[in-house]
A protein has these predicted regions:
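Structured catalytic-domain cores with a bias toward divalent-metal coordination
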Residues: 1-237
Length: 237
């Protein structure tokens, strides 16, 4: 889907609309220069949709463009994606349907853990020059100068797992909070409330350590839980 939609949209926008697009990412502040995309965390929602066998596209305009230009190029990008989705609509729906069918069979499958960005490979990006416009009391604002130079950098455009863990057929919440049902419904997650005890084989994650980041990340201190899985017969609830 990446090559089918994004690459064709990129070519269409450049050739027919004069709009240049590239994989979402940020440039490193030190040499050698590296362009790195977002990681595995579901903070944008794109990764979360992927876990549900759905396709998603993250859009962000070049932040140094004037606001009207950012609106214009974002509109062109969204319309370009929609055009490609229409052209390849049947293939995309077949892909999602096949994934849903496979998931409905209840066969075990694995999810990647300890995920990290891939090693960088050489590639070229358009590096833009900016003017720094003073704003009284607020410092400076960087504004695109419409000068863009092809620059060789290291590209890190995807991430990969360090290990895999078998995904369970279901999750059990032994002591649900009052609002849990509403949250699950809002996310379209199917669930049922047990009206009688059920014996099953389960795994329980036993936390041995909680690691809280020392620096804020998007107004949150990221929390990482370390532990081990313990399995065996269980009676629910």
């Amino acid at each position: 889907a990446r090559n089918l939609i994004l690459e064709e949209t990129r070519q269409d926008l450049q050739e027919n609309h004069g709009v240049f697009t590239f994989d979402y990412g940020n440039l490193s502040q030190r040499t050698p220069l590296t362009w790195s995309t977002y990681d595995h965390r579901p903070r944008f929602g794109t990764n979360m949709l992927g876990l549900r066998n759905r396709l998603s596209v993250l859009s962000e305009a070049y932040s140094y463009l004037e606001y009207p230009k950012r609106v214009e190029v974002t509109r062109e990008f969204v319309l370009g994606i929609v055009r490609r989705a229409k052209i390849h609509g049947e293939a995309l729906m077949q892909l999602e349907a096949s994934l849903d069918e496979e998931a409905s069979k209840g066969k075990p499958f694995s999810l990647g853990l300890d995920t990290a960005l891939v090693a960088d490979t050489p590639g070229t990006i358009l590096l833009g020059a900016v003017d720094e416009v003073p704003i009284e009391g607020l410092g400076v604002r960087r504004v695109d100068r419409d000068e863009h130079v092809p620059t060789l950098v290291g590209l890190r455009l995807s991430f990969e797992p360090g290990r895999y863990s078998v995904h369970p057929r279901a999750w059990a919440i032994e002591k649900p909070e009052p609002g849990d049902q509403e949250v699950l419904k809002r996310h379209g997650i199917q669930f049922r409330i047990l009206d009688a005890p059920v014996t099953c084989t389960s795994r329980r994650f036993q936390i041995t350590e909680a690691q809280r980041a020392k620096r804020l990340f998007q107004a949150h201190y990221e929390l990482t839980l370390v532990g081990e899985w313990e399995g065996g017969p269980t009676e629910l609830p």
